[in-house]
């Protein structure tokens, strides 16, 4: 989730937890029952989509998931609400194990945030060993 720290800081953790539950529910409604949705921790979610063969279909689903973050709480949330950035890694092309796919999805996530947040990016081999300075500075400053 983009800018979620501001929600907890300004509206409190109880409100933030309610937003997380709502967003999780909305994500689940955007995917099939055979897909897997989980919260990795903090403000990060993971979605495993099975048997989607077209990049267009994956892009459409990523857009639907981003739309799920247009929360019913948007008016209460400062600075225009929350949004999400999505990093996408494909099995088996980007990796054959969970760790490889997570690492590459994370690299794609950083690329999506670099594009301006509230969007998605597919992993690309050019991301390997690439530094993402603004994201790294956010992490270092605790944002």
Predicted segments, located by residue:
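ATP/adenylate-binding site constellation spanning eukaryotic-like Ser/Thr protein kinases
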Residues: 1, 42, 117, 125
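Residue-level recognition of strand-loop junctions within catalytic nucleotide-signaling folds
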Residues: 9, 48-53, 70, 91-92, ...
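Cyclic nucleotide signaling catalytic output domains
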Residues: 37, 64, 68, 78, ...
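HATPase_c (GHKL) ATP-binding subdomain of two-component histidine kinases
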Residues: 47, 82-84
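Conserved long alpha-helical elements within nucleotide-processing catalytic cores of c-di-GMP signaling
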Residues: 2-32, 38-42, 46-47, 53-63, ...
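Histidine kinase transmitter module recognition
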Residues: 29, 72-76, 112
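Glycine-rich ATP-lid/hinge loop adjacent to the conserved G-boxes
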Residues: 35-36, 73
